[in-house]
Regions:
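N-terminal accessory targeting/assembly segments
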Residues: 2-182
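Conserved NTP phosphate-binding and transfer environment spanning the P-loop NTPase/kinase superfamily
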Residues: 13, 68-70, 81-82, 87, ...
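Short, glycine-/Ser/Thr-/acidic-enriched flexible segments
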Residues: 51-52, 139-141, 239, 257-261, ...
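Short acidic, glycine/serine/threonine-rich loops at helix termini
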Residues: 56-59, 144-150, 279-282, 298-302, ...
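Extended, Lys/Arg-enriched charged tracts that mediate electrostatic binding to polyanionic substrates
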Residues: 115-145, 218-237, 241, 378-390
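Charged, amphipathic alpha-helical linker segments immediately N-terminal to NTP-binding catalytic cores
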Residues: 177-250
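Phosphate-binding P-loop
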Residues: 245-248, 254-263
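Catalytic or ion-translocation cores adjacent to nucleophile or general acid/base/metal-coordination motifs
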Residues: 259-345
Length: 625
């Protein structure tokens, strides 16, 4: 058995040394030794799964480790630097050997060059600091979903965030075979200023080594760049899943309540600002996870599990009317980290929270007052648009009882959403798995939200709402999704949803809570309890099935006029959409499977035939089952 290296042992306290000796994993010891030689910390602390150790991490965060207490018990706040407020796509790169090509759409750098650069920035970055070593588990414990992970960081805020978001994994590491695979994350915030923020953000790097399942992160504190178990681990998991025949997706998991108290589990992928959280948190439904899901096949069925145990959510516009469950958790005693909000009199405030904000306080820019401007003359908002909350799912009243089931839950239906003002109907079911993956998931577009008033936004392509995190060639990623239904007896139906359809005067055609009716209809379709109308691109609801749901669930009279406007088949716009998406594949995705082009051809032929028969617009009342 390989002993702990002397350079590591001499920096450990007795409790940390005993804990590390219990794990006895040569690959882990080698990773820690390399990190210590590289970053040169003064001390090393290793943390177990115990509540005592988790509390110790929180105390470190509050004792000069990047967080400050708020008046409500358990609540803390954290500020990232003004130039460190979000994920950095430009500085996030894959480290690839010369014989590995992920395609031009993925940001990469030569592995040797990239390792030299990021390790140069990490060299000596923990001098005078304490290195923290934490162990986590992605997916439920004691499960085929479980992936062990180790995080090394000098930021107690990062470690504290992970203790909320992630399942503990130290005991898992103790039982690992010596040759077991695990994910590795090394982070240093680098040199910090008097506010504890990274000074050298221009040298921010987030480099992903797919060969060693390792992520290096330096000169940054924003959780999306530093908390390894979030999107950094998703990139590693997509690569691992591709090798092993399962899926890692940027999806929520929710329980939709059908007749006779039936629960059907849906998964959903939405680009940012397209209704993902509001769907997963619909009143009367249950949530398992809001962000990342793993998928496995067992005995002819598809199962999924939430990778995390918490939420790192955007807090802007969270209010008691639109988000009652989340809002209640955020204003109740319990462990919550608020990042980049406005703080005044020991309370957190954010834009869109449903009350009047103080005119003074502190935020990510320092002392703040209403009307304060930055160096460029722009008014500084009270809270950043990407301000966040970090909370355990167990704090939510609507957590599903199967959330920690090591088997996961069966996938009843799949939803793909986007932001589209003029083309897609509010909900449509694909004809089959192949068309669902290709025409719903692999054809997602989301209009930019900063469009000029009176104009439609510019459609931005975002494959499966996962494009930023795909770590394999996009064509292979599509093929993996297509192949995943192989051996599944009845693949779950796939639906597209669109909550942003507008009329000719740019008024939204659907209400905020109408999405509940769309999902309840989809739940009935999963069980074959309602018929549907056939369009060139899929199945849409009948009016007579929606009207009773609107009345029963929303106490709303649903008119035939509203139905016709919402579910009008916009043939010309659909033809334009699929022309546009196909061109993207031909220009930018050289390994696109031929079945993608064949499917686009079939869909376009059906649309052309429908236009010859009905014209550019098809009323749903002209369609048949």
């Amino acid at each position: 058995m390989t002993p702990i290296a002397a350079i590591v042992r001499e920096k450990l306290d007795s409790a940390s040394r005993r804990l590390l000796e219990e794990i006895r994993n040569p690959a882990l010891y080698a990773f820690i030794e390399e990190a210590v030689n590289l970053t040169e910390p003064d001390k090393i602390r290793v943390f177990s799964d115990s509540s005592k150790d988790i509390a110790k991490i929180r105390r470190l965060a509050l004792n000069g480790g990047g967080e400050h207490p708020l008046k409500t018990e358990g609540h803390t706040y954290h500020f990232d630097g003004p130039n460190d407020q979000g994920r950095d796509p430009f500085s996030t790169r894959y480290l690839l050997p010369k014989d590995m090509d992920l395609g031009a759409s993925l940001n990469s750098i030569d592995r040797t060059e990239g390792l030299g650069e990021v390790k140069g920035f990490l060299k000596g970055s923990m001098r005078g600091k304490t290195m923290l070593i934490c162990f986590w588990c992605l997916g439920p414990l004691h499960s085929d979903f479980s992936i062990p992970c180790v995080q090394i960081t000098d930021s107690p805020y990062v470690a504290h965030s992970e203790s909320i978001l992630c399942r503990p994994g130290c005991e898992l590491f103790k039982k690992l075979p010596e040759d077991a695979d695990f994910f590795r994350f090394l982070h240093s915030e680098g040199e910090t200023d008097e506010n504890g923020c990274s000074i050298h953000w221009q040298k921010r790097r987030v480099y992903i080594d797919l060969i060693e399942n390792t992520v290096y992160s330096v000169n940054t504190q924003y959780a999306g760049n530093t908390v390894g178990m979030k999107k950094l681990a998703l990139r590693l998991a997509i690569q691992k899943a591709s090798r092993e025949g399962w899926l890692a997706e940027h999806m929520f998991i929710m329980g939709v309540k059908g007749p006779q108290r039936r629960t059907t589990y849906f998964v959903g992928a939405f680009p940012s600002a397209c209704g993902k959280t509001s769907t997963a948190m619909l009143p009367g439904q249950t949530i398992i996870g809001d962000d990342i899901a793993y998928f496995r096949r067992r005995k002819g069925k598809m199962y999924c599990a939430n990778v995390e145990q918490g939420i790192f959510g955007i807090i802007c516009d969270v209010n008691p009317v639109d988000d009652p469950v989340i809002y209640k958790a955020l204003v109740s005693p319990g462990e919550v980290i608020f990042s980049n909000v406005l703080v005044a009199d020991g309370k957190p405030y954010w834009e869109g929270m449903g009350c009047e904000l103080p005119e003074r306080g502190i935020n990510f820019q320092g002392e703040w007052y209403k009307g304060k401007k930055d160096a460029e003359g722009k008014e500084i908002p009270p809270s950043h648009k990407n301000a966040r909350y970090t909370i355990r799912l167990s704090a939510l009243d609507n957590l599903d009882p199967q959330a920690e089931n090591p088997e996961g839950v069966p996938v009843g239906g799949v939803i793909y959403g986007g932001r589209d003002s003029n083309t897609l109907v509010p909900i449509e079911q694909a004809f089959n798995w192949v068309e669902g993956i290709i025409t719903k998931g692999a054809s997602i577009e989301s209009e930019t939200t900063a469009a000029t008033i009176g104009q439609a936004g510019v459609p931005k392509f975002n494959i499966m709402a996962n494009q930023d995190f795909v770590s394999i060639p996009l064509g292979r990623y599509i093929q993996n999704n297509l192949d995943f239904a192989n051996g599944v007896e009845n693949p779950p139906p796939i639906f597209s949803v669109n909550y942003f359809l507008q009329d000719e005067n740019h008024r939204f055609l659907t209400g905020k809570l109408d999405k509940m009716v769309w999902l309840l209809w989809a739940e009935c379709r999963v069980h074959g309890e309602v018929q549907a109308l056939k369009t060139p691109t899929g199945w849409i609801p009948r009016y007579e099935d929606l009207a009773p749901l609107f009345k029963e669930k929303l106490n709303k009279v649903y008119t035939k006029e509203a139905y016709e406007k919402q579910f009008m088949v916009r043939v010309d716009k659909l033809i334009e959409k699929f022309d546009r998406v196909e061109e993207i594949y031909r220009q930018k995705v050289p390994d696109t499977p031929q079945i993608v082009y064949a499917t686009f051809k079939d869909v376009q032929q059906r649309l052309q035939e429908a236009r010859r028969q009905y014209g550019s617009f098809i009323s749903p009342f002209k369609l048949t089952s």
